[in-house]
């Protein structure tokens, strides 16, 4: 072996590279930790480049308002302009908006009719349509004709009166129902026993037919399931 022979030189070099990498990693961690602490500390703020202030007389809130106003676009809609004052600023006062004014409801009621006008219109629509200048003879003939009309009545009026009489409803409810159906001069229900029995039999027959038809339809729907004819799955 020579004079300058060294044993284990490869091991020493390997340990040196490992220690250097570890030291660099630790230094990187320290720098990262220091940077994080500096950003959190209120006393050590990062220096920022100064910005040129074009409007030194405006404060920060005024700049924000101007920036927001530049972003908006007014397309000529009146409902947007109503919320602004003459100088262009938004209405923030309590009484500036239309729906917060004291006379807002009164302005809305301008086109509404008064109670007297509504009563006059109802009277003209539902009241007696006789002419005021008619003679007494014409009045007597009108009353006679009006008294004869309920006795005869139209086809629908007779049908309703017989149906109501067959159900056994009292006269006040029958008159109210006839008025709701649009029959102004409803004829009085007849007390003929034969007509009442015929009407009752007709109603019973109609109810029985409806029950039979419902049973047939239900059975058809139940038995037709799965056939593909629209009765279900």
Curated annotation (Swiss-Prot):
Native source organism of the sequence: Caenorhabditis elegans
InterPro entries found in the cross-reference section: SMAP_dom (IPR028124)
Compositionally biased spans, kind Low complexity: 135-148
Record field: compositional bias (Basic and acidic residues): 36-115, 189-206
Highest taxon above the source species: Eukaryota
Pfam families: SMAP
Annotated region (Disordered), positions in chain: 1-159, 181-206
Name of the protein described by the UniProt record: Uncharacterized protein ZC262.2
């Amino acid at each position: 072996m020579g004079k300058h022979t060294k044993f284990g030189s490869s091991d020493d070099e390997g340990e040196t590279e490992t220690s250097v990498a570890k030291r660099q990693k630790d230094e990187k961690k320290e720098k990262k930790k220091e940077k994080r602490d500096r950003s959190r500390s209120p006393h050590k703020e990062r220096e920022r480049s100064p910005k040129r202030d074009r409007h030194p007389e405006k404060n920060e809130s005024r700049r924000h308002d101007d920036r927001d106003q530049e972003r908006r676009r007014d397309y000529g809609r009146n409902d947007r302009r109503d919320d602004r004052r003459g100088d262009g600023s938004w209405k923030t006062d309590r009484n500036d908006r239309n729906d917060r004014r004291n006379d807002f409801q009164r302005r809305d009621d301008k086109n509404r009719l008064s109670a007297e006008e509504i009563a006059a219109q109802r009277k003209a629509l539902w009241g007696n349509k006789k002419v005021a200048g008619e003679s007494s003879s014409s009045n007597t003939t009108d009353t006679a004709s009006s008294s004869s009309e309920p006795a005869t009545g139209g086809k629908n009026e007779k049908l309703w009166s017989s149906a109501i009489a067959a159900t056994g409803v009292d006269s006040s409810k029958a008159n109210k129902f006839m008025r709701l159906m649009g029959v102004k001069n409803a004829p009085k229900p007849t007390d003929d026993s034969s007509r009442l029995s015929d009407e009752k039999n007709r109603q019973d027959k109609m109810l029985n037919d409806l029950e039979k038809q419902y049973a047939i339809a239900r059975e058809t729907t139940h038995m037709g399931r799965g056939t593909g004819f629209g009765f279900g799955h």
